[in-house]
Amino acid sequence: MMFTKSEELLDRALKVIPNGTQTFSKSRTNLPLGASPFYAARAEGARLWDVDGNEYTDFTSGLTAIILGYNDPDVNAAVKEQLECGVIFSLPHKLEIEVSELICEMTGAEMVRFGKNGSDATAGAVRLARAYTGRGHIAQCGYHGWQDWCIGVTGRNLGVPQAVRDLTHTFDYNDIDSLRRLFKDRPNQYAAVIMEPMNKEWPKDGFLHEVRELAHANGALFILDEVITGFRFAVGGAQEHFGIQADLVTYGKAIANGYPLSVVAGKAEIMRRMEDIHFSFTNAGECLSLAAAKACLNKIRREDVPKYLLLLGQDLPGTGHPSWRHLNFAGMEEKTLFLQEMHRRGILCLGTINLNYAHTHKDVEKFWQALQAAREEDLVCEPLKPIFKIR
């Protein structure tokens, strides 16, 4: 398998784009040179073709943003119809109302505001919590985007002032005592607890409910970051899956099958403070993404897409939810070998297996066959270097 055109484009990109791409997870820090495609040409269903013409079964699914499959006909039809009417206007469009109503029906939220990226939504939820409680500190668990408030407590915090870093504190998943210690150290100072409902491991019985109870007992809001789990774990997201309701929830990724849209949703009493804080985007009401979201969410609900993903992913390797499996590597050499050999065998997977509705049992069998064969090979490219840990 040759990557000549990909590497030529990478050389060009590095002259005008820092790291050669707009998204860290798609950069050369995550793809071994000489053994990887760097640029896509097109995609259809669960298939992706790179600029060299190589075909892959794509288990990355646009970093979980593709839930129905690339070029889904229902989403495409909705977007084409809206394109004839317009993309953005000088007034709001009724799609803002229709998609908000749909999200409320599916998730149990009472009010909704839109952003574009997951980071928009999580930052908005945190600002809203601070405004509502009058407090400054945040307890977090998981990955919540690139904004200063959360990235400052990771190893990639260059440019984040210490004063901002000092307001965010991490606790460990499935360790309620680690959260108790945070509240004990700073009583009456926390505005919110924000967390992913799960990523690599399942919550222990009652853990999410314990977190919510502890947050409320200390006067803090309970925020679930469902940017990835939303509409993937169940029609109503992880809240439905685990039988819990948060004060605020953030959504993104799968909500519009790849079109840029994110959401802050929650209880009306809290959400109405959005009228007082500043959370505003020129393109938050952009209509192609809203049309895509309306079609995507209706299809997810109508065809129970999460159930299909759950059943399809039952036998996949790794840890976590069957629709979002996390592969565990002994080190960077093992991960690089995995990428090298899976690419050679026409599998695109960057370390998590992100299923979409276009994947089939045949695709899962192909993944297993490629994985078994990859274990017999040797590394022929330079191993990737460690990067900052986000989960």
Task: Give the positions of each predicted feature.
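Conserved N-terminal phosphate-binding loop of PLP-dependent enzymes in the Aspartate aminotransferase
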Residues: 1-391
